[in-house]
Amino acid sequence: MRLIPLLCIPGVITSCQVREHEQPNIVFIMTDDHGYQAISAYGGTLNSTPALDRIAGEGVIFRNSFVCNSISAPSRAALLTGKHSHANGHTDNRQRFDSSQVTFPRLLREAGYQTAVIGKWHLQSEPTGFDYWNILPGQGSYYNPDFIEMGRRYRQEGYATTLITDMAIDWIRDRDKSKPFCILVHHKAPHRNWMPDTIDFDLFDDPDFPVPGNFFDDYEGRKGAELQKMSIFKDMRMASDLKITGTDGDSITQSEKDYISYLEKRLTPQQYRAWQNEYESLSRSYNAHPLTGDSLAIFKLNRYLSDYLRTIQSVDRNTGRLLDFIDSAGLRDNTIIVYTSDQGFYLGEHGWFDKRFMYEESFRTPLMMRLPQGFEAKGDIGEMVQNIDLAPTFLELAGVSPPDDMQGMSLVPLLRGPAVKKWRDALYYHYYEYPGEHDTRPHYGVRTDRYKLIHFYGETDHWELYDLESDQHEMKNLI
């Protein structure tokens, strides 16, 4: 007589279905402040990102991917919970994440996944829902970073992006192979102050990047955009941001003192020598021919982008290493690879660096996926998606029903292909942090395919409306 497995009897059919359709592994790679303009798969011409392009080329690329609050900690909380900031309670960078909340890693772990997070966490609380965690405290350091591994703090010599990738590969190699896994590989790069690996110092030498058409924006009719302190010309620091010292002649500013002290304490002697060789010559060259006005603004843009893109080069190189390992380990067919950033970033548009605003460059974020076998979607996906969608997506892929209070929409229907008949027609955004760094005023808004409506509130009561078809750079407020 043939025995029927207990798990397949009525009442527990869900477990049987999950066994029949193997749960995919999840590798979730996220960077900090990586603008889509600096990924060649998105049509960017500033740099080449072959490994990131490989994810898009072998899978899908979302052309309209957005965040719900363009600042680090709230964005991470939204990703974990699948909820907007007002619903998960984490509205700005100054708060401590309520780790008692339901998150997708916790639910995956309960469903039998082995879970890990390695790299940047930035939520002021210890990770929960993970079998293993090894995180950077706070913002972390590019060079010889401190890590907190399951409560134990230590310092590791090396470059953060490479170290995080090494740790991720080691964890995947040594995991419990009887279980599906989910690992969050979260990089510090390319966050300010853009400290490249010494092996990338030869890239983008003597740069002459294209200047955005609205680099010298006067913000006419856009009070919300005018009231900020994120100007490359006015607010970017010569020493710690651009690595140019000695601009005050024989005197040394406090900013320069702090910058030099940090380097001396953090870098090894070999790293420090390489750093000095690179940036002292740049400082001498600048100080021999100091600039003012528009020429100085463009110099700062080039200097900023050079180091920003160098840090991305390390991300791309190490992402390629991780992809190669996954393929060589025989995991490709049943692993989804996701690449995104916690938000977008300004690369000179409107004269800015940083993020925070609902304008396109910081509202948008890259999102690319290489899919497991059985998914038909390929190439471009044009529907509007948001970072709160990733949590329910991961859960549905694992055969877990998302909680009813998750506000995101699972992307699985888009991944199965062909295009879905019905999808959302608008997105909600809300930035809260004020007063705060860069003085960006709080605002909320709604975006459709064609229009964007923004309300700046508090000290400033100001409305803006943009027609994104005729004004893609958001220069003409229709109100």
What are these regions, as identified by a protein language model?
Residues 2, 16-457, 462-463, 472-479:
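Formylglycine-dependent sulfatase
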Residues 469:
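Residues forming the ATP-binding cleft of Hanks-type serine/threonine protein kinase domains
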Residues 1-7:
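Sec-dependent signal peptide recognition
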